[in-house]
């Protein structure tokens, strides 16, 4: 059997693959051995004496199946863990994600005029100070603040209305008393005139 090392190298160059992927027909070794140029190798490829082997199948089916199981929480117990909790899910990354979510929410609320810039600033600093565990708690806090603000405004309006009402009542009472005084003075002066 003749050495076909040259032919294999030329074929791998022509087919643009590794030498392992080149198949030379064992029944036609003499004809292949005569080919010593790329042009002749191309002809042999065209005739089907030299073939590029297909890519070896490396199935990901099992891997996909395991990934789906892991999403459900399987194979993730204490015995399967190698790194520390911080190595598996860094605290800094969790913090960054939380801050970005909270700050995005605050920005949107400010742009939509749901909160004013003063409330935005105080809530921004509170978020930075680790007051809000997640988005839901921040939203609930904002709703509570707004409700308190509305209630205070309502109470203030009611108190103001009560004050104006009492002020007007006092004014009316004073006017009535003044009118009564004037009437009494008039009647007294008339009586004095009649006596004279």
Curated annotation (Swiss-Prot):
Job description of the protein: Component of the large ribosomal subunit. The ribosome is a large ribonucleoprotein complex responsible for the synthesis of proteins in the cell.
Biased composition (Basic and acidic residues): 159-196
GO BP, sorted A to Z: hemopoiesis; translation
Superkingdom, natural source: Eukaryota
Pfam families xrefs: Ribosomal_L19e, Ribosomal_L19e_C
GO cellular component: cytosolic large ribosomal subunit
Signal peptide from the UniProt entry: none
Segments of this protein annotated with the region Disordered: 156-196
Keywords attached to this entry: Cytoplasm, Ribonucleoprotein, Ribosomal protein
GO MF annotation terms: RNA binding; structural constituent of ribosome
Family in the record: Belongs to the eukaryotic ribosomal protein eL19 family.
The species this protein was found in: Danio rerio (Zebrafish)
Main location, first listed in the record: cytoplasm
Record's subcellular location: Cytoplasm
Protein name in UniProt: Large ribosomal subunit protein eL19
Assembly behavior: Component of the large ribosomal subunit.
Keyword Repeat attached: no
HAMAP family reported for this sequence: Ribosomal_eL19
SUPFAM superfamilies: Ribosomal protein L19 (L19e)
């Amino acid at each position: 059997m003749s050495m076909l090392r040259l032919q294999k190298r030329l074929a791998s160059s022509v087919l643009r693959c590794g030498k392992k992927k080149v198949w030379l027909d064992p029944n036609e070794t003499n004809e292949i051995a005569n080919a010593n140029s790329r042009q002749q190798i191309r002809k042999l490829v065209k005739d089907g004496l030299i073939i590029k082997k297909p890519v070896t199948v490396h199935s990901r089916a099992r891997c996909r199946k395991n990934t789906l199981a892991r999403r459900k929480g399987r194979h993730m117990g204490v015995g399967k863990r190698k790194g520390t909790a911080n190595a598996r899910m860094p605290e800094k990354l969790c913090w960054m994600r939380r801050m970005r979510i909270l700050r995005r929410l605050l920005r949107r609320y400010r742009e939509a005029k749901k909160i004013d810039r003063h409330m935005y600033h105080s809530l921004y600093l509170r978020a930075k100070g680790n007051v809000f565990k997640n988005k839901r708690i921040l939203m609930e806090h904002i709703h509570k603040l707004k409700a308190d603000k509305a209630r205070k405004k309502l109470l203030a309006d009611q108190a103001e209305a009560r004050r104006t009402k009492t002020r007007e009542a006092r004014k009316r009472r004073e006017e009535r008393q003044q009118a009564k005084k004037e009437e009494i003075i008039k009647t007294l002066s008339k009586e004095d005139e009649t006596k004279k």
